[in-house]
Amino acid sequence: MEETGIKSIVIKEICDIARKYNVQKVTLFGSRARGDFKARSDIDLAVQGGDFIRFMLDVNEETSTLLKFDIVNLDEEIQNELRESIKKEGKIIYEEI
């Protein structure tokens, strides 16, 4: 996932937190998924299933990055354009099998 500018340890931490809170799927989207990010671009995540609030809090507090996160709950209503964008350009970084 280095092409996203996100260190592999941070991806692992996100996956561990997803597992901890029974999240079904985490998708990276936005500039980091497209590859047109800047050094300080935030990390956009779309989340399905599990305890969204606790996942979001832990990702913001317990990952070893100073980058900001923008986390969207796909189990709630979001703009159709955003949902389509996530579907089109998103990269799945965690999926419960």
Question: Positions of the model-derived regions?
Answer:
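Catalytic core of pol beta-like nucleotidyltransferases
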Residues: M1-K25, A33-A39, Q48-I97
